[in-house]
């Protein structure tokens, strides 16, 4: 290999192009952003001691459907006979 080629490669490795450096910087920033998102998600995971949502309000008894609403549509009822 020519010494000029080796000198050019050596120069490139020691002084990367602005485009390559921008690529490296962007990847570093994206990794930092992803790490921060992972940390925030880990903090947001619910623990039994501190749930994300308050417990649902309890009702005395859930409403029961009437016999007419509970009957299957194809089943004959006293009113339809």
Swiss-Prot record:
The record's Gene Ontology cellular component field reads: host cell cytoplasm; host cell nucleus
Subunit structure and binding partners: Interacts with host TAP1 and TAP2; these interactions inhibit the loading of peptides onto MHC class I molecules.
Free-text domain note: The N-terminal active domain blocks peptide binding to and peptide transport by TAP.
The name this protein goes by in its record:
ICP47 protein
Listed under GO biological process in this entry are: symbiont-mediated suppression of host antigen processing and presentation
Q: InterPro entries from the entry?
A: Herpes_ICP47 (IPR008026)
Task: Output compositional bias ranges, type Low complexity.
Answer: 72-81
Q: What are the subcellular locations of this protein?
A: Host cytoplasm; Host nucleus
Q: Looking at the record, which segments are called Disordered?
A: 37-81
């Amino acid at each position: 290999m020519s010494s000029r080629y080796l000198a050019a490669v050596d120069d490139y490795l020691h002084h990367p192009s602005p485009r390559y450096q921008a690529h490296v910087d962007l990847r570093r920033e994206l990794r930092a952003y992803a790490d921060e998102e992972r940390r925030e998600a880990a903090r947001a995971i619910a623990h039994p001691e501190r749930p994300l949502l308050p417990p649902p309000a309890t009702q005395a008894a859930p409403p029961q459907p009437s016999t007419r609403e509970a009957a299957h549509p194809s089943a004959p009822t006293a009113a339809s006979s």
